[in-house]
Amino acid sequence: MKIWSSEHVFGHPWDTVIQAAMRKYPNPMNPSVLGVDVLQRRVDGRGRLHSLRLLSTEWGLPSLVRAILGTSRTLTYIREHSVVDPVEKKMELCSTNITLTNLVSVNERLVYTPHPENPEMTVLTQEAIITVKGISLGSYLESLMANTISSNAKKGWAAIEWIIEHSESAVS
């Protein structure tokens, strides 16, 4: 098992970042996300928005990794559940792969909150737990996947900035 974590600060208020995060896919920074389907969306009694989405992704696994895993499949599906609490100003998003679960599990958690010292900024904390199952080079593959997650996180931050920039230019 490998744990990866990160923190990023956006120079935008929470509301702006959340609106962009909800519209993050598709984006030109991370073309590996091929599609997003909303399976369920509801507002609970406390006014929190719950969303359940299915993401179709193309894991660009190197041929060596595919050989070690014993699969040629690179199209994967991810289940994503998010809760947006506009009163507490908190968005929590949890995702897990639902494809190749016999070989690997990736559980990711993202939390967006206003910066504690500057409400014009937003803090994103991310954590991913990666587990490769029953493979002799499992820890090596977990480290490779953690590096990929780190790279994709940076693309995600850039995508949110891109969406905000393009949303603001569309309004002006």
UniProtKB/Swiss-Prot annotation:
Gene that produces this protein: PRELID3A
Q: Which GO terms describe its molecular function?
A: phosphatidic acid transfer activity
Q: Would the keyword NADP be found if you checked this record's keyword annotation?
A: no
- Keyword set includes Mitochondrion: yes
Superkingdom is Eukaryota
**Where does the record say this protein resides?**
Mitochondrion
Gene Ontology biological process: phospholipid transport
Q: What does this protein do?
A: In vitro, the TRIAP1:PRELID3A complex mediates the transfer of phosphatidic acid (PA) between liposomes and probably functions as a PA transporter across the mitochondrion intermembrane space. Phosphatidic acid import is required for cardiolipin (CL) synthesis in the mitochondrial inner membrane.
Q: What is this protein called?
A: PRELI domain containing protein 3A
GO CC, alphabetical: mitochondrial intermembrane space; mitochondrion
Which family is it part of?
Answer: Belongs to the slowmo family.
Ranges of residues in domain PRELI/MSF1? 1-172
Q: Where is this site: Important for interaction with TRIAP1?
A: V36, L49
**This protein's UniProt keywords:** Lipid transport, Mitochondrion, Transport
Complex and partners: Interacts with TRIAP1.
Fetch the InterPro entries from UniProt: PRELI/MSF1_dom, Slowmo/Ups
